[in-house]
A protein has these predicted regions:
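Dynamic helix-loop-helix/coil hinge segments at AAA+ ATPase domain boundaries and subdomain interfaces
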Residues: 1, 44-66
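Interdomain "pre-motor" coupling segment immediately N-terminal to P-loop NTPase/helicase cores
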Residues: 2-50
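Phosphate-binding P-loop
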Residues: 75-83
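Walker A/P-loop nucleotide-binding motif
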Residues: 83-99
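Loop/turn-to-beta-strand initiation segments
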Residues: 84, 111-113, 144-147, 175-181
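Post-Walker A helix-loop "phosphate-sensing" segment adjacent to the P-loop in P-loop NTPases
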Residues: 104-117
């Protein structure tokens, strides 16, 4: 606000404007600056893998069977207020991470706290925290954001201890926040990836995330000739060289 006030003092045209109007301008500028700074912090703290992701740039014509109406509805972020989850599934390179980050950016624009993390990295964080005595603090770091993006969900089958970590995290988030799951496996395969009948927690974990969830499965009409979304969005360094 101080900079804006000095600009007014140094600009002769502002001398013709009543003080009340000039003060209102300063308030508007300060309000806009604070909103912009808050948005920048939210995006920075989210740690997006693809911070350039934009919901308007999602490709609907590259052989993906995407429901544009559903994606547009999810972009309004009403699912966050409803504490509903989102499952994004599909093969490697189909655009799951890009889409999830685009939804995350929309959440930030509406000032919802958001966090992106790969599930393998999250589990490592919790393992280290357990050994250092900071488990609850680190668990809260991922339990508290209103939107949590879990990339590479169940890429590897979790150990028994990791299953307990996943259960604790999702139990804390249940009916309080929204989680976006990105997985190469279809939802029907998650139970087996969690240990199936051999795991006492598999049912409990699925129960805490499946209710009223939205689901987007990115498929290929012609897998043999379809190109990777990393190529479409120019995200693959090798493809840019």
């Amino acid at each position: 606000m101080a900079d804006a006030f000095r600009n007014q003092l140094n600009d002769p045209k502002f001398k013709e404007i009543p003080f009340e109007d000039r003060f209102a301008m300063l308030v508007d500028i300060e309000y806009s600056n604070r909103k912009n700074n808050r948005l920048k912090r939210l995006i920075r703290n989210a740690g997006f893998d693809q911070p350039e992701a934009n919901i308007m740039d999602i490709n609907y014509t590259s052989g993906r069977k995407l429901n544009k109406n559903l994606i547009s509805r999810l972009a309004t972020c009403e699912y966050i207020s409803e504490h509903r989850n989102l499952f994004i599934t599909g093969a490697t390179g189909c655009g799951k991470t890009y889409m999830a980050c685009a939804f995350g950016m929309e959440a930030c624009k509406r000032y919802f706290t958001t966090k992106y993390i790969r599930l393998p990295d999250l589990l490592i964080d919790l393992e280290i925290a357990r050994s250092e005595g900071s488990y609850r603090k680190v668990l809260a770091k991922y339990a508290n954001p209103l939107v949590l993006i879990l990339d590479e969900w169940l890429l590897l089958k979790p150990t028994e201890i990791e299953q307990k970590d996943i259960f604790e995290l999702l139990h804390r988030r249940r009916k309080k926040s929204s989680t976006i799951f990105c997985s190469q496996y279809g939802f029907e395969e998650w139970y087996d990836q969690l240990g199936g009948d051999d795991s006492p927690l598999a049912d409990a974990i699925i129960d805490r995330i499946a209710h009223d969830s939205y689901r987007i499965n990115i498929t290929s009409i012609d897998a043999e000739h379809d190109i990777s979304m990393r190529e479409v969005y120019g995200l693959d360094k090798m493809l840019r060289e």
